[in-house]
Amino acid sequence: LGKYSSIIIFDPVPAKMRDYCKISKELKSDGSNVAGVLCALAPEEKKKVEALVSSYVRPLSERDINKVISEPVSLIKSDAMLYCYEDWNPEQPVDARGMSDGTLRFIAIVVALLAVAPHSLLLIEEVDNGLHPSRAKELVDMLKDLSRQRQVDVLCTTHNPVLLDELGNKMIPFVSYVTRDENGDSHVNLLEEKENLTKLMASGTIGRMMVNDKI
């Protein structure tokens, strides 16, 4: 762990993201001030980051979101709110209160990957929580893409077999699973070291192994 410049535990809470938040340069661990972090950026940088966030969210949503922005609110412009624009009503912005939990968590994770320092370790529990299973590919692609660009390692937990399947066999060396012994103690195991892994993989995917209680 000494190789990392920082270790961040990130667990975005959509309910908190729907409130107004203070404009701030530091992202909170619950993602509640995503809008404030975006608003704290210099104008040109803000446009670039919002465009990048939008590009990852665009293929994600069933509501056809084409743009995600953050804007200051109140008379003194000290607070911020997250907004999106949808294809079916492009002139009418929708604030965070009208966005789904899955979309808000996804936005928060994108912003977190852009906000943390290079060579950090970002830990995200139940990374796909609130996201429709059909969007697992978009989530995996985003995590791979941004972590590579930003030189950030990402450690995620999930109970979703669809997400595990989307990882593909090339990611097996990076997958671990947790078991309990007869004393109730938990143990983290590398998937690639599992006995009879080749035989198990011949009869199904990683997700199927999980569903069948093989891992």
State what each model feature region is.
Residues 125-126:
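Walker B catalytic acidic pair
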Residues 100-103, 136, 160:
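Alpha-helical structural signal
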